[in-house]
Structures are given as structure tokens and as C-alpha cells.
Regions:
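Short beta-strand-centered aromatic/proline hotspots
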Residues: 70-76
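Segments surrounding the PLD/"HKD" phosphodiesterase catalytic module and close analogs
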Residues: 109-119
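Phosphate/adenylate-binding glycine loop and adjacent helical scaffold
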Residues: 100
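Acidic loop->beta-strand submotif enriched in PP2C/PPM serine/threonine phosphatases
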Residues: 83-93
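Short, conserved beta-turn/loop elements at beta-strand boundaries and strand-helix junctions
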Residues: 78-84, 127-129
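Protein maturation boundaries and topogenic segments
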Residues: 1-69, 89-91, 117-119, 123-138
């Protein structure tokens, strides 16, 4: 019994603080990710260390729908100019600007604005499934 509890504790610690598997669903990241639930490996350390960079694909808590997550690409980090902005909009400290790769079918920072980095759950480093489309993203 103690062995099972110990395993559970370690598993919880690893998936909470180091790496985790999650599903990315929806058309907003096509063609990079499939709309039909790609299973991806998340690096959960990078956001905690402030190592999220422009171009990274991240999973974050949804800014508009509690209990849901979004999978988007970081298009600007704090201090960088918002891409495509007609004004001199700059991402504020502690935030990132998230966009879907499929701009025509994505609800992203163009709708909900800058996203606080503390709701970024992890950086996508690997598509695990479908197996024939496995891909490294770092």
C-alpha cells in the first residue's frame, strides 16, 4: 500500500511541476496541430522559469471559459509589439500575446487581449499522438 501511495505522490509531482500529457482540440492550431485531439507533451518547467518565447506553442487556462484550456502560439512576450496592431500596442509585463495558427478560426488574444503568464500551464514540446504524426516542437 505504501508503495502505491508513494508512486501516486511522485506521479502527481511530476505531472504538476515537470511534464504532463494533454489533448489539444479544435481547429485554431491547424495545420500545425490537428483539430481532432492531438496528444501533446507539455514542459511545465519553462513557464515557471519565465522561459516562454515568441514562437512557442503553449497550453493555458482559457481566459474566457473557466475550467477549459486553450492551445495557441506565443506571438509576442512582455515588452514586444503586438503583431498586426495598427497602434503601438506592447504586451504588458507578466503577459504574452497568443494567436492560433489558423487565424480565420481562432478565438485568441485578438479577442481576449494579453494573457497573464501565470495561467500558462506549459510549453508544447512533442506531439505524441497520432503516432504517425509525432513531432518535436522545440
Amino acid at each position: 500500500m505504501w508503495g502505491l501511495a508513494k508512486f501516486g505522490f511522485y506521479f502527481w509531482g511530476v505531472t504538476t511541476y515537470v511534464v504532463d500529457l494533454t489533448l489539444c482540440t479544435g481547429p485554431s492550431m491547424e495545420p500545425t496541430l490537428n483539430a481532432n485531439s492531438d496528444l501533446v507533451l507539455l514542459d511545465r518547467v519553462s513557464p515557471r522559469l519565465g522561459r516562454i518565447a515568441t514562437g512557442d506553442i503553449v497550453v493555458a487556462d482559457s481566459p474566457t471559459r473557466p475550467g477549459e484550456t486553450v492551445c495557441k502560439r506565443v506571438s509576442a512576450v512582455a515588452g514586444e509589439r503586438v503583431p498586426g496592431s495598427f497602434f503601438a500596442d506592447v504586451v504588458p509585463p507578466g503577459c504574452v500575446w497568443l494567436l492560433g495558427d489558423n487565424r480565420r478560426n481562432s478565438t485568441d488574444s485578438r479577442v481576449y487581449g494579453p494573457v497573464p503568464t501565470d495561467i500558462v500551464k506549459g510549453r508544447v514540446v512533442l506531439r505524441v499522438w497520432p503516432l504517425d504524426q509525432a513531432r518535436v516542437f522545440i
